[in-house]
């Protein structure tokens, strides 16, 4: 444990041991990072690993990363709606199946962030979007999506009821994700969070 398994940059210490312990490299959070700091972390890290995942990246940060890696022959992909940057190739041999579900179209950015992260880490993902409880038939007409799932991720704002409904339909682990979508007494996602925490269906 005392061995140095990180890249020392002064302003950051990029963890090299994470990939050996967890099976995938440390994820880089772009949120709040200076572009110079972010690009330097990426440049140093990509020399030691075959792929990188950067989350909460703005377009300007992606452009800075792409410019920095311009001379290196490596694939750089930006998913604007999810604010994710993939560097390198994703796993081709997918393991398991995860369904990512969201209640409304406004919840898609959160759902896509989860879905793309799962794909980056090597899982097969089935997406089912805009199936909130206001039109429950949309969900019930697509329940076959849950067949063979190892896990389900459900994102919802407003009243946050969708995870409880899905929880009553599946036997695999379910991760409920509240979003800030809503108005009135939604309190920027707090209402959805409390609904999910008090769900009576197994999750």
Model-predicted regions and their roles:
Residues 142-179:
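Glycine-rich phosphate-binding loop
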């Amino acid at each position: 444990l005392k061995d140095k398994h990180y890249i020392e940059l002064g302003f950051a210490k990029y963890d090299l041991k994470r990939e050996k312990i967890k099976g995938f490299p440390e994820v880089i959070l772009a949120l709040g990072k200076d572009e110079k700091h972010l690009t330097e972390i990426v440049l140093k890290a990509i020399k030691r690993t075959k792929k990188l995942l950067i989350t909460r990246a703005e377009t300007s940060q992606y452009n800075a990363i792409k410019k920095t890696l311009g001379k290196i022959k490596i694939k750089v992909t930006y998913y604007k709606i999810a604010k994710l940057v993939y560097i390198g190739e994703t796993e081709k041999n997918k393991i398991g199946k995860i369904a990512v579900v969201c209640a409304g179209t406004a919840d898609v950015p959160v759902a896509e962030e989860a879905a793309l992260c799962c794909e980056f880490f090597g899982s097969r993902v089935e997406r089912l979007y805009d199936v909130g409880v206001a039109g429950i038939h949309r969900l019930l007409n697509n329940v076959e999506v849950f067949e063979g799932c190892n896990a389900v991720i459900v994102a919802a704002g407003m009243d946050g009821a969708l995870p409880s409904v899905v929880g009553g339909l599946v036997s695999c682990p379910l991760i409920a994700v509240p979003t800030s979508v809503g108005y009135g007494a939604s309190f920027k996602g707090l209402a959805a969070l409390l609904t999910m925490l008090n769900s009576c269906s197994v999750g």
